Amino acid sequence: MPRWSKITLKVIGILIGLILIIFSALALYVNSNKESLLQTITQKLNKNLNGTLTIGSMEPTFLRGFPGVSIKLLKVTMRDSLWKNHQHTLLDAKELEVSVNTLSLLKGTVEIKKIGINDAAIYLFTDSNGYSNTAIFRKKDKTKKKDDSESSSPEIRKFTLNNVSFVVDNKKGHKLFQFEIYDLKGNIDCPLLGGWDAELKLKTLAKSLAFNTRRGSFIKDKLLEGPFKVSYNDNSGIVQVAPNTLNIGNDPFIIGAKFDTSKENTEFTINIETKNILWRDASALLAPNITAKLNMFDLKQPIHVYCTLGGNMGPGGDPSINVKALVKDNTLTTPGGVVDNCSFTGQFTNSYISGKGISDENSAIKLFNFKGSYAQIPFSIDTAFINNLNKPIATGIFKSQFEIAKLNNIIGEEMLKFGKGTANVKLAYRADIVDFQLTKPYVKGLVDIQNADVSYVPRKVNFKNTAISLNFTDHDLYIKNIRLQSGKSVVFMEGSVGNFLNLYYTDPEKILLNWKIRSPEIHLGEFIGFLGTRKPKAKKRTRQSNFSENLNELFEKSQVNMNIKVDKIYYSKFLATNANADLLLTENGIAIKNVSVKHSGGSVSLNGSIAQKGSTNNFKLNTVITNVDIKNFFYSFNNFGMKTLTSKNLKGYLFSTTNISGVISDKGNLLPNSLYGSIAFNLKKGALLSFDPIKNVGKFAFPFRDLDNITFTNLNGKFDVRGQKITINPMQINSSLLNMDIAGIYSMSTGTNITLDIPLRNPKKDADITDKDEKRARRMKGIVLHLLATDGEDGKIKIKLNRNRDKTK
């Protein structure tokens, strides 16, 4: 072995031996002076305390603090001077390990380099008056010059906490922070310029992080694990926590913070960021009052969240909360439905207007560039804004372009069923939020629908190639550019509703929709479904009513005022031209006003009403008929239910006034025997053609007269209609065949009883008489037949002599 190696080994051996001798001496010294050392340590630790620190016993543990001297203090308690009043011990530790500087110890002084607290409870208490048991620690008087004769306070370089319960209980500020610290290790560096820098490694269970105990705790029962770098500046009193990754539960967070201890109530700002957290996991970290609201929603994929908490440790309410969330291509579940392909940037604050405090009333949510798809309908909202979470109000601009058939996914097919066509929507809205759903939205903007096929299911009415433009203003609704096509019918419409949205939500019965309707051609048979019974009934509106139910109720209860102009109207055999009408549609029926049409060379005007009762429709009509071709008139209305007298038997021009009521079926047919009322008529240039009841009698009585073409110069009369029976008021018939006085009852079943007084003289003999009085006097000259038309045994009308006539007439 080389000589230098031997020398080196000897030196090392001497040093080791010297160290062992020193430690043996120290051990002997500590054991010999245990009580005095315990007293010295206690005095040192009590030096700057407003209270008492007591130590039960002390045991040396040299190897743990090598090369320093370690001492284990058992049953350590620390109580402030007012402990008897509040009964909250600041520190109660079963074991406290202290490592002291060896050289200082040999000099007779104590310099603490490390302290460890095991199996302990730390309770920082502040009562309702603001007094805290941390008052045990005396504040340094910065104005007082340091006395060289005074020894400095002990500096702690390292510390550890194991199995420590740490509580901050602030009764005045309604705050409760409670942690079960499994393991905490820290290294502290004290720069020459003052302050300190610390590196910490933490593993703790958060039992409570309640900034307002009346609201509940954040991150309750969550495990926190991770490192911290903390610095403190003596001059500013600011504690700075550098951003580091801290695991809260199973989610990593980047957390940084700042605490300003120079203020009477320490102010704090905590910055939190997580790049990949599920919505429900994030909501579970918040206070229960916030969690309950957020859990009404859900996002399927993780999101990126930034959060800043700010406040102070003094009395007061909640901390300020500012949250920013980034959502992309996610699935959003809401109480109102599911939004697919959802992307947006969201912001939340509980102090929206500066100076108005922190509260739900001053809270706001903003959603920027919101895009998604609801029930396969894509839409976007540039900026959605919700403020005042106590009575939340949502505003925004809703935009969407979609195939209109997709509306069936939202409103169902019970009322409106959509086929092809497109919709373009741009609406600014303002709505209350009740139970996390938009309620009573007020909208402003446009809805355009083009080339759409729509079926109105309750009435079985179908429209093709429909167009409509809805313009919502602040108060009113304007409906423009409407094109409806049902079969051969094409209708162009424009409408308006005053005070629409207000009445829609509060009193739909008062809604009055004004329509201007124009059409080149309408086939009424294609709209016959409006006479039928509606399949679904309108339900009483509730908070849970869906859009379809509310719209259905609107259609049922609102009033519609129509001004109609139609070039041609077809119904079965009926054709009218130049039609004009004013209709008022209400929940109870239809009021018909100022109706005028051209028909069969003349005109028809009418007023009346239609009331629906189940599967039938009761109508009342007052009509004025002027110069209408009676043949076409009877043909158009299927001879008004008569089988004996038809359009083939009639000729002439009809002038008439009627006051009639009746019943139409849901198929649009006049129900037999349902007509009641009166008909006054004047038939000019009339003729009765091949009318069998006349021919059957006339071929025997008047074999040489023309029975196939019986002409009338003027025929006036009045009929009273009572269902199956028509009362023929006494009337005179002056024809080319014969003259006749007629009166009685014509029945469409049984009960016909018509008296006929027929002079047999040929009316042509009086054709050249111009004097009306003379013609009237000669009218009944000669032989007069008194006949009675009544029911025969075979059910047909039979003509016989009227032997029981009133002979005084």
Predicted ranges, named:
Residues F712-F719:
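Generic long, charged, amphipathic alpha-helical segments
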Residues V721-T727, Q732-S736, S749:
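Extended serine/threonine-enriched, polar tracts that run as long, contiguous segments within proteins
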Residues S128-A135:
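A short alpha->loop->secondary-structure connector
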Residues I55-S57, L73, A93, I112, ...:
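Hydrophobic residues on conserved beta-strands that form the core of alpha/beta folds
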Residues L20-D127, L193-G195, R214-F218, E225-G226, ...:
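Terminal hydrophobic membrane-targeting helix
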Residues K44, G51, R64-F66, L105, ...:
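Membrane-proximal interfacial segments on either side of biological membranes
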Residues K75-M78, A242-I248, L367-Y374, N481-L484, ...:
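Short beta-strand segments that buttress and anchor functional surface loops
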Residues P2-L18:
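N-terminal Sec-pathway targeting helices
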